């Protein structure tokens, strides 16, 4: 009798875990991420084609300078305040993969960052969803 109850209990726990994992997988919808295009406006200010980007842990984000190859920087205030495993990257193309743990306390987590071209800065954000 105890063996039967133990198997049933294990089955219940396994089913609950599978359902929870399924709900988590559905919560963060993966999309074919297009690169974020970085340009410079007539006023010299950096511009991006999306001011707010929603991503999942494990997604790869890529910024590309549109136009003549030009260096730009993606900067976060600190490594702890970055959804990536880096604080700053510079180049004509910048790529980062959203790290595990970027979602804090199981809640949607917003990260402000700077796009810097020369001395001009723009401050969009990345939102990481569970």
Ranges and model annotations:
Residues 66-71:
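Short proline/glycine-enriched turn/loop motifs at strand-loop junctions of beta-rich domains
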Residues 63:
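Residue-level hotspots at or immediately adjacent to binding/recognition sites across diverse folds
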Residues 74-90:
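Short, compositionally biased
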Residues 12-20:
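Bacterial N-terminal signal peptides
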Residues 88-130:
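Extracellular/periplasmic metallocenter environments
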Residues 2-12:
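Bacterial N-terminal signal peptides that target proteins for export
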Residues 28-60:
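N-terminal edge beta-strand
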